[in-house]
């Protein structure tokens, strides 16, 4: 499944590009790419990675640490420049949530209302509102008159650095034998990820939620590595403490690591409800890791208990936050726009693209008098109508879902320009050109090239993990072919890939938007880095083996 999915992604991204030119209509366009040009771009990236690995091999840890500092500094620099010169402001849903937080601070209790409140349509946004309320209250303490959203964007830039740092630290647990060269490839990927920089100015849930995810996943990986029985652990880290149950202190560390992982993963759901997809992946991993042969009864019970706690907290965090606000306001919120209406909308045409937002969900909720049962009935009727039409026109159905898929997974910009387009003036001429001028096509091409690298690296990683062992021949590439360590990876290594697979299936039937795929692209970066490193190692081994064969024949 991993191999087929990654092959499909690289094929679609390599042959096509989806993008938007008109920032008013934001219609998603599809074009066919020049394969030769894409190969040239991939070769350029390959040369960059090869040079990076060569320098890492010569300079060792100093180069890696320097590259980490450079990467974090680059994020801070570009993110800060985007705040100063981009002047992006919240818009659409982001503005509604931001204004709700600001109005609540001013004492407007109508923010919590069963009919007239934005939150009565989208109560899942209340967690993000609580987070923004905290940031706005902190900003108000400064007494400065500048708009608070600039401060929020600065916090987001810092959170992006946190996300990168903890994802970088996770590599040590994902690939303990090869994490140093893989980390160099990862940092190069981060440095070239321009849509990620643009999203640091998007005052919404993506960046803070991903930061919480990165911390939570790091703690999860650390926990699962520590729970491995001592007799089955081989580690190259002198300070690694993977032996379980040897002391009360270690047991306390394990418990606090588990609680920390639960806390941050729960916060990610509070900030962005779609993070539940990754939570499901984590729960699957915890369940199967608990049943893994060799686990002690204590470890099995502990992992099962963690899964139960994570289920309760991730499902209950948003209702809990909502209850707190309702108690303070002395009022209640409605149940909100139904999920069924999103599924129905995902089967319909839109001016932006197949399955994209067309207002059906909120129009249906209004037409039903904000009654969830009535809205679901209307949505089910719309779904049945589309299913009947698809059956009568199978060619249209295939074309519809093909374009829906490409509009999300073949957009290398991840709708970053559309998401951060709004401004009240003051945007620099350079960034105006990036958004709507002559540099827009260059930005689209940059994003497309980066996405091709991402999918190719993921494909190489998946090929490496399914490759059958072959008997060693003592050649220079024997280590690459015979003792390929990726084949012995634990299940928890694939948590991110499982989440991406779940997201792929979910967004095939949900409302379409390439912005929703942005977080999945960040989750794929470690796997891409590992695949690129393995591909370059195999290429170097093949060249070395070919040279030896030539010399032996001569």
Briefly describe each language-model feature range.
Residues 99-100, 117-146:
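Short hydrophobic/aromatic helix or loop-helix immediately within or flanking a transmembrane segment
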Residues 95-120, 127, 351-359:
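Extracytosolic helix-loop segments that constitute the early lumenal/periplasmic catalytic or substrate-binding loops
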Residues 167-192, 494:
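Transmembrane-helix signature of polytopic, membrane-embedded enzymes
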Residues 28-44, 147-156, 403-500:
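Membrane-interface anchor segments at the N-terminal boundary of transmembrane helices
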Residues 152-159, 185-220, 268-278, 516-521:
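Multi-pass, polyprenyl lipid-linked donor-dependent membrane glycosyltransferases
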């Amino acid at each position: 499944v991993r191999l087929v999915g990654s092959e499909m992604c690289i094929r679609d991204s390599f042959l096509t590009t989806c993008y938007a030119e008109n920032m008013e209509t934001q219609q998603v366009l599809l074009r066919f790419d020049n394969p030769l040009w894409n190969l040239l771009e991939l070769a350029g990236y390959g040369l960059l990675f090869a040079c990076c690995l060569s320098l890492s091999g010569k300079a060792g840890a100093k180069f890696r640490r320097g590259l980490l500092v450079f990467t974090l500094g680059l994020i801070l620099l570009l993110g800060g420049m985007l705040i100063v010169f981009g002047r992006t402001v919240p818009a659409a849903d982001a503005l509604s949530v931001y204004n709700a937080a600001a109005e609540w601070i001013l004492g407007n209790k109508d923010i919590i209302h069963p009919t007239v409140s934005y939150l009565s349509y989208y109560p899942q946004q209340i967690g993000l509102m609580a987070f923004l309320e905290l940031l706005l209250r902190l900003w108000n303490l400064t007494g400065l008159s500048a708009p608070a959203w600039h401060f929020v964007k600065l916090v987001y830039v810092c959170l992006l650095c946190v996300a990168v740092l903890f994802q970088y630290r996770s590599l040590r647990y994902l690939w303990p034998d090869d994490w140093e060269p893989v980390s160099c490839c990862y940092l190069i990927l981060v440095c070239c990820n321009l849509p990620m920089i643009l999203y640091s100015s998007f005052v919404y849930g993506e960046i803070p939620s991903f930061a919480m995810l990165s911390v939570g996943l790091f703690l999860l990986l650390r926990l699962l590595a520590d729970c491995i029985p001592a007799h089955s652990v081989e580690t190259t880290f002198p300070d690694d403490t993977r032996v379980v149950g040897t002391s009360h202190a270690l047991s306390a560390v394990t418990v606090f690591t588990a609680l920390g992982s639960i806390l941050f993963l729960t916060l990610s759901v509070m900030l962005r409800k779609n993070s539940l997809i990754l939570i499901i992946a984590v729960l699957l991993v915890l369940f199967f890791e608990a049943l893994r042969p060799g686990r002690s009864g204590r470890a099995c019970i502990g992992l099962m208990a963690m899964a139960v706690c994570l289920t309760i907290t991730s499902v209950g965090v948003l209702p809990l936050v909502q209850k707190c606000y309702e108690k303070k306001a002395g009022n209640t919120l409605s149940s909100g726009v139904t999920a069924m209406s999103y599924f129905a909308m995902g089967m319909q045409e839109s001016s932006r693209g197949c399955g994209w937002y067309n207002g059906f969900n909120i129009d249906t909720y209004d037409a039903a008098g904000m009654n969830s049962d009535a809205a679901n009935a209307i949505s089910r009727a719309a779904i049945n109508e589309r299913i009947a039409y698809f059956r009568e026109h199978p060619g249209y159905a295939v074309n519809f879902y093909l374009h829906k898929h490409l509009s999300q997974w073949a957009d290398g910009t991840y709708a970053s320009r559309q998401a951060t387009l709004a401004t009240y003036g003051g945007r620099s001429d350079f960034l105006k050109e990036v958004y709507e001028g002559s540099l827009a096509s260059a930005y689209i091409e940059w994003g497309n090239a980066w996405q091709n690298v991402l999918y190719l690296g993921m494909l190489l990683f998946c090929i490496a993990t399914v490759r059958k062992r072959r008997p060693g021949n003592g050649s220079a590439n024997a280590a690459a072919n015979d003792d390929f360590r990726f084949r012995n990876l634990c299940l928890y290594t694939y948590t991110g890939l499982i989440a991406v697979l779940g997201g792929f299936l979910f967004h095939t039937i949900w409302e379409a938007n390439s912005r929703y795929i942005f977080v999945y692209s960040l989750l794929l970066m470690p796997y891409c880095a590992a695949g690129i490193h393995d591909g370059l190692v195999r290429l170097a081994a093949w060249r070395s083996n070919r040279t030896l064969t030539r010399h032996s024949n001569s």
